[in-house]
Amino acid sequence: MLRISAAIRIAALISVLTLPVSFADQRTANWTGDFPPCNQRFELLKRDPMSLGVKIATSNPILAHEFREALDFWAQVVDMNWHEDDSNSCAMQLVDGTPAILKTSIVARSQFTEWDNFQGLIAFNPKAPLTNGEFYLTAVHEIGHMLGLKHNPSIHSVMYYLDLQGNEVLDESDLTTLAEHHKLKVGSLNEPVAVIEP
């Protein structure tokens, strides 16, 4: 019995040792769609000040407005400026998501800069029954992903994965992660930054 137990432990150890260093280190592929890629998308990877051309390609004018407001918010936090660019020379593009991209109950989805097939795309359901404020908070959240942020387990963070309420912040964890990727305009990483719709 002892030999069987030892053999099982050795087999388990061998199988663990043959796995990649970390599942998190494995590259994951971004979703794709029938959209032209943004040719300047790698501007989003710069640590230096960024100048982002943004293509607003949505059929929903309210979403377009709130997305612009969300970009203005990020321009106060990260050392970046943005301008509209309707060409493929954009760095980021807001598109109307298809059912293949936005599964049931998913309102928006961003691509991740570090994943394969990154094209600079953020997809929204233009018919989602959201208020202006909900479009704004969701846009801030999705742009945050493009700037290097992951989901945050704190319900107070705008990067929380579910049900944004309107009193969210960028917390110390969010700001610290942002500072690893980009120059920031905020004075302190310890002071939460309120995400308030203008």
State the predicted function of each range.
Residues 48-52, 90, 118-120, 155:
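Envelope-exposed proteins and targeting segments
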